[in-house]
Amino acid sequence: EPVGSPFIHVMLANIPPEIGLDTLRHGLDAWEKYTGVRPAAGWNPECGWASFLPELYREAGFQSLVMDADSFFLSFPEIREATGLSYDVQGHSNKNHLFKIEEYIRDKPEFLRYLTNPSAAPNGLNMIFRSDCMANPMLWYLMGATEGMRSEPVSPGEIRAMLENWKSRIAASGSFIMPYAEDAEYIGTSAYFYVKQFNQARFFEPEPSSVARFRELLDTATSLGYELSTPSEVIENAGPPIENDLIEQIENGVAWHGGTAKAWANTEYSRLLDPVCRSIFDGIALLQKRTGGRKELDDALKALTSAWVSDSRWPPLPTSPGRFNVRETLDDLYRANGFLEKAMEKAGIRELRALYSPELMRTQIRCIEENLMSRKYFGEV
């Protein structure tokens, strides 16, 4: 089953909802254009959270959304206290400590049921929860890497034991589990694994053995009696979803892996780029009101959305984004500003620079360009 997402990998919780809605629809349009299928299930990049997201996905046309269970569980004071986990916008994540959540809820059906049943947001959007308590060991298994204190990689036997443990939990509390919902690029490459886990400048190295290991995951699951299913199938077969208004207690600005979406908004790159993005967005909104819908304004919105991509703002110190990521965002800002200039010309309001000044904005983009391009980026020698 295809799973839709924003066309541009943006942190939806950190940008104007209007931008988020447009790129969600753009993503669905792209799926339909190239495959003939319009996804019903949705993915939220990095599972960043804000209260408006269920409404955003519903308005875009999604019927269901994959949710992060760890940030949901950490919204319960008793789980936060039992695990000792906390959030900090300067922290990278709690990824390798989220097993503490599993240790606390493993014999508590009142919590397990959110992992083993679909639930419904107050607006009717169906939700399926994923957790690092299963996904993280599986990721380390796929990479064949060692985990901090470990001397040996995660073994097939450990994966089998984990799946066996969850069989009884599913039977006691629901009907399914979503064990692995992670970045797809880890199946075939190392993606940013070594950057995130070891602060090493190793990007997207080929990992062909991870493909074979992924097959082993599937074979192990089916040998234990698991049946493979899609998000829409488990929702259809599970009966009435749990009415879940507790999602309104998830902290604004958190994300998956026990991290925060606000970490992306608090890097030095975001602090330079985001005010410029916001100024251009305000210009688009003002010109839309003044001139009505124009193609140039939609082009500007698409270019601005691309400029808000998460990868030009992340990862935080001691690493950094890639120079090419930041360069692309700067180019997108120049393009968005150029489209606004054309929109004003075609509307005959070029001289009304109290509305928006493309000339002045061009110098502002150049100012941050000089700052950002003069830096040394992670991995550069």
Sequence positions of predicted segments:
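Active-site and substrate-binding clefts of carbohydrate-active enzymes
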Residues: 83-89, 93-137, 143-150, 154-381
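Beta-rich nucleic-acid/ligand-interaction surfaces
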Residues: 46-53, 72-76, 237-240
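CE4/NodB-like, metal-dependent polysaccharide N-deacetylase domain
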Residues: 20-46, 118, 166-171, 176-180
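Gly/Ser/Thr-rich loops at beta-strand to alpha-helix junctions
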Residues: 41-51, 185-186
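Hydrophobic, small-residue-rich alpha-helical packing segments that form membrane-like cores
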Residues: 55-59
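Catalytic or ion-translocation cores adjacent to nucleophile or general acid/base/metal-coordination motifs
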Residues: 64-91
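Short, charged, surface-exposed secondary-structure boundary motifs
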Residues: 12-15, 73-82, 137-139
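Short, well-structured secondary-structure segments
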Residues: 1-16, 23, 40-44, 63-68, ...
